């Protein structure tokens, strides 16, 4: 009986956040539409804002909030039921969902862990070297695992936790600073960088690509994204552990046993399994098609479908695995709602209206100054978001429109905001899916997490806008 009551409490609606969400939506709804904007666009904006607030305050799970938003959109006649459900037929959504399924193969077969242990075995003799081995393990995995939460939480975090405890570093006995705190903070921050480096390294990156095309007419392909990100990304991966090593140094500087631990783990895993070989083949197939498929008119979502079909055919994944992948189905629901809302806000003129309104506010500045101001505002506004996807859905289109309207080259603006959309999770312990996993281990106090995150945010902005800017100049992006 007690357990049933506890379960009921856990699943209960949070009344105060729900009332706030509904109240904000109603207030915006009944405010007269601004001049130059259709009432229908304003009403959809009210639903959109309420949805974002619901995602942040979480009176219900995100999927449930999305269903509520869909119901209100259709019931009020703001959009037809066909338009309301149009997001579920979006190929970008299905690329994300299918990629979730493929990432399950890395975890289920143990291939992801094996790759990481090999890196530790080769490069993990010192604590700093160990941190680099973990980051570059993440880098290798990132193009094929679009859920940075699955990549960091399902592969990198367990390895760090195991290594930390092996070296006697645990918050339970007050030894978290030995090695665990440093590795966890470095692993988390590195995950954000690798997420920024590839179109397929974070679930919302394909959404960004779609918004960039819809708003600015920019096509962000897998290859163009990776080439633009490679230099600032690698520089960030090199600098970040050094900064954390200086700000929050580990007590253990040498880790001669790390390679031995990795070797033992690899022995426990045994020889390369048939399922792992199948996973490698699919990984390479998908990666090659994501890079070169455009030359053969093979869409990225088609590539993902091919990869999933092969995994099912080879029984690396079963249909039960697919059904049990709750994160994928949850993502399908709330991503579909967000994409639909964002699409029709653009179609109904909301984004262009906001762009024109904001353009006047930065009209006195050169495009470079306006560009920097808007990038910084976009980055630090993430303190108010508990989800990168929610932030991207709420602000990416509008900020891109304003930056382009101010005179910035569209490709430069789209890419810069895209990269920042991954990096801004560095600031808090709730700003990305992986953050609660790493912070929740208890190795790093909140104040230290935030202070290091803020310093690293400055480092990220400098690296990506200055070093990245020079690289993009070489590439002819601006």
From Swiss-Prot:
<feature type="transmembrane region" description="Helical">
    <location>
        <begin position="96"/>
        <end position="118"/>
    </location>
</feature>
<dbReference type="GO" id="GO:0005886">
    <property type="term" value="C:plasma membrane"/>
</dbReference>
<comment type="function">
    <text>Might be a malate transporter.</text>
</comment>
<protein>
    <recommendedName>
        <fullName>Putative malate transporter YflS</fullName>
    </recommendedName>
</protein>
<keyword id="KW-1133">Transmembrane helix</keyword>
<feature type="transmembrane region" description="Helical">
    <location>
        <begin position="187"/>
        <end position="209"/>
    </location>
</feature>
<dbReference type="InterPro" id="IPR001898">
    <property type="entry name" value="SLC13A/DASS"/>
</dbReference>
<keyword id="KW-0472">Membrane</keyword>
<feature type="transmembrane region" description="Helical">
    <location>
        <begin position="64"/>
        <end position="81"/>
    </location>
</feature>
<feature type="transmembrane region" description="Helical">
    <location>
        <begin position="398"/>
        <end position="420"/>
    </location>
</feature>
<feature type="transmembrane region" description="Helical">
    <location>
        <begin position="364"/>
        <end position="386"/>
    </location>
</feature>
<comment type="similarity">
    <text>Belongs to the SLC13A/DASS transporter (TC 2.A.47) family. DIT1 subfamily.</text>
</comment>
<feature type="transmembrane region" description="Helical">
    <location>
        <begin position="41"/>
        <end position="57"/>
    </location>
</feature>
<keyword id="KW-1003">Cell membrane</keyword>
<dbReference type="InterPro" id="IPR030676">
    <property type="entry name" value="CitT-rel"/>
</dbReference>
<dbReference type="Pfam" id="PF00939">
    <property type="entry name" value="Na_sulph_symp"/>
</dbReference>
<keyword id="KW-0812">Transmembrane</keyword>
<dbReference type="GO" id="GO:0022857">
    <property type="term" value="F:transmembrane transporter activity"/>
</dbReference>
<feature type="transmembrane region" description="Helical">
    <location>
        <begin position="300"/>
        <end position="319"/>
    </location>
</feature>
<keyword id="KW-0813">Transport</keyword>
<feature type="transmembrane region" description="Helical">
    <location>
        <begin position="222"/>
        <end position="244"/>
    </location>
</feature>
<feature type="transmembrane region" description="Helical">
    <location>
        <begin position="12"/>
        <end position="31"/>
    </location>
</feature>
<feature type="transmembrane region" description="Helical">
    <location>
        <begin position="450"/>
        <end position="472"/>
    </location>
</feature>
<feature type="transmembrane region" description="Helical">
    <location>
        <begin position="277"/>
        <end position="296"/>
    </location>
</feature>
<feature type="transmembrane region" description="Helical">
    <location>
        <begin position="332"/>
        <end position="354"/>
    </location>
</feature>
């Amino acid at each position: 009986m007690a357990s049933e009551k506890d379960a009921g409490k856990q699943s209960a609606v949070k009344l105060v956040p729900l009332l706030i969400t509904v109240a904000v939506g109603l207030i915006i709804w009944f405010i007269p539409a601004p001049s130059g904007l259709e009432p229908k666009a304003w009403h959809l904006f009210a639903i959109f804002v309420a949805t974002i607030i619901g995602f942040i305050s979480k009176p219900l799970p995100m999927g449930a909030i999305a269903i509520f938003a869909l119901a209100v959109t259709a019931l009020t006649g703001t959009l037809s039921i066909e338009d309301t459900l149009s997001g579920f037929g979006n190929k970008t959504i299905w690329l994300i969902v299918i990629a979730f399924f493929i990432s399950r193969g890395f975890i289920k077969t143990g291939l992801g862990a094996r790759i990481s242990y090999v890196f530790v075995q080769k490069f993990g003799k010192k604590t700093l070297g160990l941190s680099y081995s973990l980051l570059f393990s993440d880098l290798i995995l990132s193009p094929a695992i679009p859920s940075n939460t699955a990549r960091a939480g399902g592969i990198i975090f367990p390895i760090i936790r195991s290594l930390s405890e092996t070296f006697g570093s645990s918050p339970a006995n007050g030894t978290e600073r030995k090695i665990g705190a440093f590795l966890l903070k470095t692993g988390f921050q590195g995950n954000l960088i690798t997420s920024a480096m590839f179109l397929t390294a974070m679930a919302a990156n394909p959404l960004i690509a779609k918004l960039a095309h819809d708003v600015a007419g920019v096509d962000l392909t897998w290859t163009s994204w990776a080439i633009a990100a490679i230099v600032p990304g690698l520089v960030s991966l090199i600098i970040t552990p050094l900064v954390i090593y200086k700000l929050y140094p580990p007590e253990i500087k040498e880790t001669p046993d790390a390679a031995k631990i990795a070797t033992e783990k690899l022995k426990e895993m045994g020889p390369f399994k048939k399922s792992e070989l199948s996973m490698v083949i699919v990984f390479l197939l998908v990666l090659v098609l994501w890079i070169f498929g455009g030359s053969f008119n093979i869409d990225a979502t088609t590539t993902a479908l091919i990869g999933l079909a092969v995994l099912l055919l080879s029984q690396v994944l079963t249909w039960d695995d697919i059904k049990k992948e709750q994160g994928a189905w949850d993502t399908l629901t709330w991503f579909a709602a967000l994409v639909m809302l964002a699409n029709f806000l653009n179609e109904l003129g909301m984004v262009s209206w906001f762009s024109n309104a904001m353009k006047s506010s930065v009209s006195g500045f050169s495009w470079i100054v306006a560009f920097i101001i808007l990038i910084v505002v976009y980055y630090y506004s993430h303190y108010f978001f508990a989800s990168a996807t929610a932030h991207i859905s709420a602000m990416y289109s509008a900020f891109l429109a304003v930056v382009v309207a101010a005179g910035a080259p569209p490709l430069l603006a789209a890419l810069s905001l895209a990269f920042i959309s991954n990096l801004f999770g560095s600031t808090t312990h709730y700003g990305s899916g992986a953050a609660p996993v790493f912070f929740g281990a208890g190795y790093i106090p909140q104040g230290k997490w935030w202070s290091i995150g803020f310093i690293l945010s400055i480092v990220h902005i400098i690296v990506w806008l200055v070093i990245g800017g020079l690289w993009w100049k070489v590439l002819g992006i601006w």
